[in-house]
């Protein structure tokens, strides 16, 4: 598969976003106080590494197959670590990390939503 210059640039930009997410979520897994949140950030970082790798494969001309019906989060039911009235520094730290994570994911998903229209190949669009 031969990519256009615009497609190549879009994939490289997305890889940059994924690399930033990997670094952020790895750091957040170390900073989080709640053990389940630590594990969640580790899991998200691993998923971002997979995204980064699949974008690299696409840049090299091979589009990996993907499951467009990803349901792994469907059964995620973490137990509450903090109480509603808890105003501890640990809770505030974890709240900041989660809020920033959500904002980051919204930003990056917006990039994917825009960049999907750059590609003519339906397999790459599925990947994104």
Regions found by a protein language model. Give the residues of each.
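N-terminal leader/targeting segments and the first structural element of proteins
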Residues: 1-5
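Acidic/histidine-rich alpha-helical segments that form the ligand environment
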Residues: 7-31, 78-127
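Conserved alpha-helical segments that form or flank metal/cofactor-binding pockets of metalloenzymes
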Residues: 35-76
């Amino acid at each position: 598969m031969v990519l256009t210059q615009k497609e190549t640039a879009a994939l490289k930009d997305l890889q940059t976003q994924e690399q930033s997410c990997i670094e952020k979520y790895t750091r957040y897994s170390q900073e989080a106080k709640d053990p389940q949140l630590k594990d969640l950030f580790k899991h998200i970082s691993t998923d971002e590494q997979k995204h980064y790798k699949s974008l690299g494969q696409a840049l090299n001309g091979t589009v990996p197959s993907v499951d467009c019906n990803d349901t792994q989060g469907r059964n995620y039911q973490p137990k509450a670590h903090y109480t509603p009235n808890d105003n501890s520094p640990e809770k505030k730290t974890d709240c900041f990390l989660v809020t920033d994570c959500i904002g980051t994911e919204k930003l990056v998903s917006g990039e994917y939503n825009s960049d999907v229209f750059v590609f003519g190949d339906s397999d790459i669009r599925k990947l994104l």
